[in-house]
Amino acid sequence: MGNELFADKFIDKQVDNPKAPSSPCDGPGQRFEEVMSDPSNLLIDRCENAGKVIDGNIVCHNNIIVPEKSYYGDFADILTLNKGVHEPAEERMFGEVLNYIPDNGTIIELGSYWAFYSMWFSKEVVNANVYCVEPDSKNMETGKNNCKLNNVEADFTQGRVSNLDGFRPAPNADYNNFNVKDFVEEKNIEFVDILHSDIQGCELVMLNDIVPLLVDKKIRYLFISTHTQELHYSCIELLEQHDYRIIASADFDDETFCFDGIVVACHKDNLDIPYTSLGCRRHTPLRSTCMV
């Protein structure tokens, strides 16, 4: 890569930014400034029409198109302002990881919603096997429509990882328990190249469920969105206990430039990608959206 410490160059300890108070569902607010201030933006290649609205569809940085306002309503405006990027650090690392996925690779996207990462995987991996899991029926329909729009074939399953202590899903959600390990067995999936998870507070429950897969080294890379500071570091601890190393991390309270924290991991024997700093939102000067 060569840019493992790139984001650290922007850190200024004299700056002390509080975390934006709202999630995407509550409106953009300071969230746009944080996303656009992420140094990872500078390392993401953008296609020619990235961020443009063409025939009612927004062009993402990787040439994937999605209907305007299809991602948390007005929050989709970040795709226009930020030239097709909505989660800079995560998208930076996802793009890097894709370089190491072989033909016939498999992705399981938990909490897939609009299926962004699944579609991207499918576009880059020859003969990709794509599995999308989403608890909310309306969100799942959004993902299906996006896949159709981008000529992507994917296997969709409605279900959620159970966690009584987690955040409650939307009214259209399926409350039936979803277990990743059981799913892998039912679908006869021999190896998971990317397990991508954004499951609203149930991430540690999910990781405990897949310990047998971790022990057997059945997962090449994990992308885990974290939803509290405690959960973030508990997820890291569990992964490291089972011989997975952290290749990128931005915690929930201080480091992430997005509302969620992010952990990217692979088995310790996999040395393809060195540890990469994702910077620190709290100590990075924010870029005003009026500068765009």
Mark where each language-model region is:
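S-adenosyl-L-methionine
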Residues: 1-133, 141-145, 152-155, 185, ...
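Short internal loop-to-helix segment that lines adenine-nucleotide cofactor pockets
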Residues: 81-108, 155-217, 223, 229-230, ...
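Acidic, metal-coordinating catalytic cores used for nucleic-acid/nucleotide bond scission
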Residues: 114, 139, 201, 228
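Glycine-rich, phosphate-binding/catalytic loops in enzymes
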Residues: 124, 149, 211-215, 240-241
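A short, structure-level motif marking secondary-structure boundaries and short turns
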Residues: 128-130, 219-222
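Conserved SAM/SAH-binding beta-strand->alpha-helix loop
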Residues: 136
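A short beta-to-alpha transition loop/helix N-cap that caps and shapes the active-site region
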Residues: 139-142, 165-167
